[in-house]
Amino acid sequence: MLNFYNTKITVAGADEAGRGCLAGPVTAAAVILPIEFKNAVLNDSKTLNLKNRNFLKSLIEDEAITYGVAHVFMKEIDEINILNASILAMHRALQVLKFDPDHIIVDGNRFKPYQKIPHECIIKGDGKYMSIAAASILAKTYRDEFMEKIHEEFPDYNWKKNKGYPTKEHRAAIKKYGVTKYHRKSFKLLPDQLKIDF
C-alpha cells in the first residue's frame, strides 16, 4: 500500500460502494489524509472483516484532515443510470470536503472532471493508495449502516445480510414479494435475475 500519490500537493482519494446492488443507494466517500498517516490494517474495504472496517471507519473519521460521504438514491439512479450516479455520488462527497484538493485520485477507470481539479483514475486504486482505501471503507460502512436501517422496514429481503446485492436469497425474495420503494427500477429484475439455481 502506497502512502501517498504526491506529498507536495493535497490529494483526495474517492471511491464508491453499492454500484452492483439491486436495492439501496450508491454511496461515495472522499478523503484527504495527513501525510504522516499510517496504518498497517488499511486496505480495500472488500478485503477486510466487519470488525476491522468499523475500527478503521472511526480512525479515518478522527484522523483525516477532511472527509465527505454522500448517497445517490434509487430515483436518481434510475433517471441517470448507475455509472453516472456513482460519479455524481463522488462529486457530492467531494463537495462536502472542508476545502478543495489540488488533485483527485479515483478508484476504477471512469470519472467526470470535478471543478477543473486534475484527476486520475486508478484501477484497483483501493488496494494501492491509502486515501482511496480510506474512501472505500467510509463508503462501504456508511452504506451498510443505511441498508441495516431499512432492513427493519422490509426484513423479508434480509438487507442486513446481503446489503442489497443480487444474492440468490435476495432474488428469491423479490420473486416472492415483489420490489419495494428501495429497489432500483432500472435494473432488469425479470426474468433473468430472478432465475435461481439452487
Swiss-Prot record:
Residues that hold a divalent metal cation according to the record: 15-16, 107
A Gene Ontology BP annotation from the UniProt entry: DNA replication, removal of RNA primer
Subcellular location field: Cytoplasm
Entry-linked Pfam families: RNase_HII
MF GO annotations: manganese ion binding; RNA binding; RNA-DNA hybrid ribonuclease activity
Keyword Nuclease assigned: yes
Keywords for this protein: Cytoplasm, Endonuclease, Hydrolase, Manganese, Metal-binding, Nuclease
Reactions mediated catalytically: Endonucleolytic cleavage to 5'-phosphomonoester
Protein family per UniProt: Belongs to the RNase HII family.
Name this polypeptide is given: Ribonuclease HII
Source taxonomy: Bacteria, Pseudomonadati, Bacteroidota, Flavobacteriia, Flavobacteriales
